[in-house]
Amino acid sequence: MATTKSFLILFFMILATTSSTCAKLEEMVTVLSIDGGGIKGIIPAIILEFLEGQLQEVDNNKDARLADYFDVIGGTSTGGLLTAMITTPNENNRPFAAAKDIVPFYLEHGPHIFNYSGSIIGPMYDGKYLLQVLQEKLGETRVHQALTEVAISSFDIKTNKPVIFTKSNLAKSPELDAKMYDICYSTAAAPIYFPPHYFITHTSNGDIYEFNLVDGGVATVGDPALLSLSVATRLAQEDPAFSSIKSLDYKQMLLLSLGTGTNSEFDKTYTAQEAAKWGPLRWMLAIQQMTNAASSYMTDYYISTVFQARHSQNNYLRVQENALTGTTTEMDDASEANMELLVQVGETLLKKPVSKDSPETYEEALKRFAKLLSDRKKLRANKASY
């Protein structure tokens, strides 16, 4: 209820902000948002691989990376992990993972991450392997070293408040300059599935600052697109490169939002008669699924309405599979067979139409989006050279 109320407040604030300014491509803010969904992160990973390949082709540069084109990359849960993989620098100050490396990461490590602990008390998975592999991959890198602005959400169960890790917040809140592996584990620590994560940083005065964090989906309910747009708006207001952008002027935003799939209309749905017999535990599991699905639909609805109201619907692309069935609906089924099915879902999704009203496929839409990103990057570079 509180989440819906906050969405509505932001929604009407956006609609109330009008602007007749025509956006200059070089001054537009580019935003990538990636949903949570556990092992279903394979689906957006396929999309990212395709998009990065298109950018490399358009710019004739095999070393082009997504972080070179987006001003803000935001994610929650598995989307936060993807965000870190494509923005955390290696020893050459380039993203340590190309988009094509992400699916192999899931295929190799997924079965070990989602390896049932066997305990009847506590979470289903102990999280030890997940934390270990994140430490190995991300090392000692901290938020301030990210190659572009990031927005990774989590929730502090001790303070009962969301915690959003961004570079732009560090001057005011240096305690947020945490290690990326701590952030990634925290945003993925879904209640029931993984233990909460405790770690410390230090304030500007050198005092210890404690975090007691769980999955970012608790804060953003699975879809971080509105969060990512909010961070982008603040970034635009503070950066002179975006001087023409007004507060909450989404007409000057380019947003790509990637989902991890929702269930088919008739898969894992329930009747009132069935639900009337449920106990607290059964409701707990069902509510998480229902809340994530509702969030995905409603966030997309709000954002679509805003962009359409600004006659800027081509500036927003939501890539989502809405017909998952069987094992592909599970966020923790990391069996080889299911992961291969998720790869197929992502590849098939590229060939599907963006909407029932348009023959344009996601593949075609992403090619168009890649051209916009490329042109904007070149215009920005030319402007900076004068």
Swiss-Prot record:
GO molecular function annotations of the record: monoacylglycerol lipase activity; nutrient reservoir activity; phospholipase activity
InterPro entries on file: Acyl_Trfase/lysoPLipase (IPR016035), PNPLA_dom (IPR002641)
Coiled coil: 321-384
Pfam families the record matches: Patatin
UniProt keyword annotations, A-Z: Coiled coil, Glycoprotein, Hydrolase, Lipid degradation, Lipid metabolism, Plant defense, Signal, Storage protein, Vacuole
Signal sequence, renumbered to the chain: 1-23
Motif (GXSXG): 75-79
Active site, renumbered: S77 (nucleophile), D215 (proton acceptor)
Motif (DGA/G): 215-217
Localization annotation: Vacuole
PROSITE patterns (UniProt xref): PNPLA (PS51635)
GO terms for cellular component: vacuole
Gene Ontology biological-process entries: defense response; lipid catabolic process
Superkingdom field: Eukaryota
Glycan attachment positions: N115
Tissue: Tuber.
Family statement drawn from the similarity comment of this UniProt entry: Belongs to the patatin family.
Entry domain remark: The nitrogen atoms of the two glycine residues in the GGXR motif define the oxyanion hole, and stabilize the oxyanion that forms during the nucleophilic attack by the catalytic serine during substrate cleavage.
Note: Patatin have a dual role as a somatic storage protein and as an enzyme involved in host resistance.
Summary of the function given for this chain in its UniProt record: Probable lipolytic acyl hydrolase (LAH), an activity which is thought to be involved in the response of tubers to pathogens.
Protein name: Patatin group M-3
Annotated source species: Solanum tuberosum
